[in-house]
Every structure is written in structure tokens, then in C-alpha cells.
């Protein structure tokens, strides 16, 4: 897969870890294999992230959006993707976000 899609949310409490795990499990069932592969998560430094390897970052993001549209945390999402062998992110959401990083 050529890209890494990162779905990122701010962390407000340790209870968010359970939410992250549940969201990751949901996402594994929501993204068809031809759209991407959920490859784990990261929690700490004030943020939580889910990583998806994909050749279709926009479509994989839409799959996530469909899966999480009723999830209260969805409104806080930041999403971006980068080449699997690169460091420069292209922001998907929110549109006004200029810089994206994984701490």
C-alpha cells in the first residue's frame, strides 16, 4: 500500500483509550480490504491516532466517516495521509487545517 491515512483526535481523559479501541475495532470492519488495512493505533501526548495503510486515502477516509458519523468523537477528528515512505502529510479534514503531525 502506498499511503498511510491517519485519523487523529484530541485526548481529554484516560477513558478515551477505551473509545479508541472500540473505534479501531469498528473501523476494521468498515474499511473493505481493497480500500485499506487498519494497522493499529497510538495513544499519548494529548492525542490518539488510528493508522490505515491504503492506496485510496480519500475512499478509506469516507469509509471511516460513514462508520463514525454518529460517534460523538467524530466532530473532533483531524485526518491526513502521507506516502508510506514519506513524512509530508496532505490534510483531508478539517479543510482549514494547515499543519498535521503525529506526536
Per-range role (PLM):
Residues 86-103:
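Short, low-order "capping/linker" segments at domain edges
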Residues 5-34:
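Surface-exposed, low-hydrophobicity interaction/linker segments
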Residues 2-9, 100-103:
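Long, intrinsically disordered low-complexity tracts in eukaryotic nuclear proteins
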Residues 10-13, 40, 55, 92-95:
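A preference for well-ordered globular domain cores
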Residues 22-27, 62-69:
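Short amphipathic alpha-helices in soluble, non-transmembrane regions
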Residues 50-52, 83-88:
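Short, conserved secondary-structure transition motifs
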Residues 34-67:
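Short, intrinsically disordered low-complexity segments
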Residues 70-86:
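Conserved short beta-strand edge segments in small beta-sheet-based binding/regulatory domains
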Amino acid at each position: 500500500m502506498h499511503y498511510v491515512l491517519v485519523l487523529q483526535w484530541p485526548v481529554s481523559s484516560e477513558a478515551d483509550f477505551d473509545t479508541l479501541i472500540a473505534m479501531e475495532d469498528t473501523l476494521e470492519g468498515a474499511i473493505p480490504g481493497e480500500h485499506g488495512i487498519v494497522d493499529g493505533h497510538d495513544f499519548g501526548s494529548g492525542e490518539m491516532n488510528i493508522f490505515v495503510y491504503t492506496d485510496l486515502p480519500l475512499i478509506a477516509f469516507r469509509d471511516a466517516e460513514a462508520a463514525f458519523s454518529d460517534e460523538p468523537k467524530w466532530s473532533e477528528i483531524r485526518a491526513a495521509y502521507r506516502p508510506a515512505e514519506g513524512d509530508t502529510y496532505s490534510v483531508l479534514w478539517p479543510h482549514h487545517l494547515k499543519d498535521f503531525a503525529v506526536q
